[in-house]
C-alpha cells in the first residue's frame, strides 16, 4: 500500500512483519520494520524491494540501446517490486492472463481479501496453502474465470512453487510453462517477481504486444514480443519492466531494426 510517499508492506519472516519504506530526496531508502526477527525481516525486505542485487551492469550495457536508452536515463533507479512468496507471483500470473493490468490488480486484491490473513490494514502474502483449500467454484464466485480458478487450485495443491528458488531460472520457467493453463508470460511473471530472476522476460505481455504493434506497424503476435526481448539476454526480465513503464510514460519510437 502506497500512501503519502510511504510504501507499507506485510510479509512473513520468522513471523508476521510490517515494513514502511520511503525514499529520501537524495535517494536512500528509509525503512521502519515491526517484526519479532528484525534481521530476517530486513533481509526479506531487501529481496522484495530488489535492492539485494546491483543492476548497474544492465544500465551500462543498454545505455545506448535505441529502445531502452532514454528510459534508462530517466528511470535508472527503477527496480521491480517483487512478491514475498512465489505463490503470490503465481496468483498475479493467473489473475493477469489476457486482461488489463488494472483489472488484474483489482481481482488479485479481492482474492487476497477473501483468502489471505490480515496483518493490520494489510494482507499477508499467500502461500501454497492459501488457495489449496478452496474449490474452484468459490474463486469463480469471486470473479476469477473458471479455467484460471481450476489452474490456481490445482497448482496450489500439487506444486510447491517456493522450491523453485533452488533451481536454475530456465528449469523454473520451463516447469511453470508446462502447466496446463499457464504459458511463457506466466513463467516470466513467476521468475521475475517471485524468484527475483532477470533472465526470463514477459513474453506475450499485452503491453509489449501493443508496443510491438506500434514499432512494427502491424498487429503484433506474442512471438514478436519474444523477438523484441531476445537481444537483452540475461536481462530480458528487467528490460520488460523498463519497456512497459517507458511505454506508459512516453511512447517509444520505431527504430531501424524494428
Per-region residue spans from a language model:
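HhH-family (HhH-GPD) DNA N-glycosylase catalytic core used in base-excision repair
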Residues: 1-258
Amino acid at each position: 500500500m502506497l500512501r503519502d510517499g510511504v510504501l507499507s508492506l506485510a510479509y512473513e519472516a520468522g513471523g508476521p512483519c510490517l515494513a514502511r519504506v520511503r525514499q529520501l530526496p537524495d535517494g536512500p531508502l528509509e525503512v521502519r520494520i515491526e517484526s519479532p526477527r528484525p534481521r530476517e525481516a530486513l533481509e526479506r525486505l531487501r529481496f522484495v524491494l530488489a535492492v539485494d542485487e546491483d543492476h548497474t551492469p544492465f544500465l551500462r550495457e543498454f545505455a545506448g540501446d535505441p529502445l531502452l536508452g532514454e528510459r534508462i536515463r530517466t528511470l535508472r533507479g527503477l527496480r521491480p517490486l517483487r512478491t514475498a512468496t512465489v505463490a503470490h507471483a503465481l496468483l498475479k500470473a493467473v489473475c493477469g492472463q489476457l486482461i488489463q493490468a488494472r483489472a488484474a490488480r483489482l481481482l488479485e486484491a479481492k482474492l487476497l481479501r477473501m483468502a489471505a490473513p490480515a496483518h493490520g490494514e494489510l494482507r499477508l502474502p499467500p502461500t501454497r496453502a492459501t488457495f489449496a483449500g478452496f474449490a474452484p467454484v468459490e474463486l469463480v464466485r469471486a470473479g476469477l474465470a473458471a479455467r484460471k480458478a481450476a489452474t490456481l487450485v490445482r497448482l496450489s495443491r500439487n506444486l510447491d512453487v517456493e522450491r523453485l528458488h533452488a533451481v536454475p531460472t530456465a528449469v523454473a520457467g520451463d516447469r511453470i510453462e508446462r502447466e496446463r493453463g499457464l504459458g511463457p508470460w506466466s513463467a516470466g511473471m513467476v521468475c521475475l517477481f517471485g524468484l527475483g530472476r532477470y533472465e526470463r522476460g514477459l513474453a506475450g505481455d499485452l503491453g509489449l504486444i501493443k508496443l510491438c504493434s506500434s514499432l512494427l506497424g502491424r498487429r503484433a503476435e506474442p512471438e514478436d514480443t519474444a523477438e523484441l526481448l531476445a537481444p537483452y539476454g540475461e536481462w530480458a526480465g528487467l528490460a520488460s519492466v523498463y519497456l512497459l513503464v517507458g511505454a506508459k510514460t512516453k511512447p517509444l519510437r520505431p527504430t531501424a531494426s524494428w
